[in-house]
Amino acid sequence: MNLFRRLQFDLWYLGSPPWDSGITPPEVFEFIQSHPAGRALDIGCGTGTNVITLAKAGWQVTGFDFASRAIQIAKRKIKRANVQAELFTDDATRMKNVSGQFELTLDIGCFHGVPNKVDYLTQLDRVLAPGGFWLMYGFLAQTSDPTAPRIDSADLSRISAQGLTLLSQRNGFDKRERPSAWFFYQKSKKK
């Protein structure tokens, strides 16, 4: 991510960004209830709401965001929640500080805004364990503006080519009536 974009997000976190609801989505709870705890990576974890939810459910959680202000807030929230988690600032297209593999990678609103999705998917392949799950939420393509956050058909083709199988897709709309979807992928058990 470029410096301007990083600064822009840090400034959002001086207040309350519209995407930081402080509420874990029902799709995350559904996953927790139907899968045994393991290692989870929250990509673009923001202020740590879902990191806390996963940790309370017995998951060993790592979370990162490229907005350092968000990570500062997340560390305070995790301390108040009295849970253990590893948090740091990182870039989803590099994941320099992420080590090991995870049974769950969670991405709520990160992938759709990443300019270099190929590098993101390369890193996802590195950190997602064979047989692991990628639970991802994002905006669907709705405009010809290439700078608008979105997931389009080319992205979905890249994801499939990466060896990820789409288990389910739930289309809907966000609060501002923008088309969005929850995607639930599983990585092949063999690589």
Model-derived regions: residue spans:
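Conserved class I S-adenosyl-L-methionine
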Residues: 1-35, 37-46
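Conserved SAM/SAH-binding beta-strand->alpha-helix loop
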Residues: 67-69
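Conserved SAM-binding loop
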Residues: 74-75
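Conserved SAM-binding strand-loop segment of SAM-dependent methyltransferases
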Residues: 81-93
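A conserved beta-strand element that flanks and buttresses the S-adenosyl-L-methionine
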Residues: 106
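A short glycine-rich, Lys/Arg-flanked "PGG" loop and its adjoining helix->strand segment in the class I
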Residues: 119-130
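Conserved beta-strand signature within the Rossmann-like core of class I S-adenosyl-L-methionine
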Residues: 131-139
